[in-house]
A protein has these predicted regions:
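Surface-exposed amphipathic alpha-helices with a cationic face
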Residues: 39, 65-70, 92, 113-119
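Alpha-helix termini
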Residues: 23, 27, 92-94, 115
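Conserved anion-binding
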Residues: 11-13, 17-18, 96-128
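Short secondary-structure transition/capping segments
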Residues: 58-61, 88-90, 111-115
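Active-site loop-to-helix "anion-binding N-cap" substructures in soluble metabolic enzymes
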Residues: 75, 81-100, 105-109
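Conserved N-terminal beta1-alpha1 strand-loop-helix module at the mouth
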Residues: 1-74, 82-86, 124-126
Length: 128
């Protein structure tokens, strides 16, 4: 069996954060710095999750994905704030390999079936 290491980077306000016993967050720093570190440590995939994008109606992590896709060469997945096909197309164009649908999958389960029709999308991860 092939084993893979997938690093998850939780981001809030453009800063890498670490949850503390489900009670709070500690700021760790620049997500681009840490993703390069994990890339150099030979992870197989990096998952970027904006932990409050939907809650605050924030833009998706487009700027971070655009910067990091030029510096690391592993699979990249993104979650947080994805609401429509346009968001997914933008992420794929910037170098994202997978999308993670959270709140929108709960609000609109048909959304998953709609985006399955996108020819450029290879994998969707839905979390409930």
């Amino acid at each position: 069996m092939y084993k893979r290491i997938i690093s998850r980077l939780d981001i809030k306000n453009g800063i890498l954060v670490k949850g503390i016993s489900l009670e709070g967050l500690r700021k760790l720093g620049d997500p681009i710095f840490f993703s390069k570190k994990y890339y150099n440590d030979n992870v197989d995939e990096i998952h970027f999750q904006d932990v409050v994008a939907t809650l605050y109606g924030r833009d998706i992590l487009f700027n971070i994905i655009e910067k990091i896709s030029r510096k690391i060469f592993v699979n990249v997945s993104v979650g947080g704030g994805i609401k429509n096909e346009h968001d997914i197309d933008n992420l794929l164009r910037l170098g994202c390999d997978k999308v993670v649908i959270n709140s929108e999958a709960v609000r609109n389960p048909n959304f998953l079936f709609l985006i399955l029709e996108l020819p450029s999308l290879a994998q969707i991860i839905a979390t409930f």
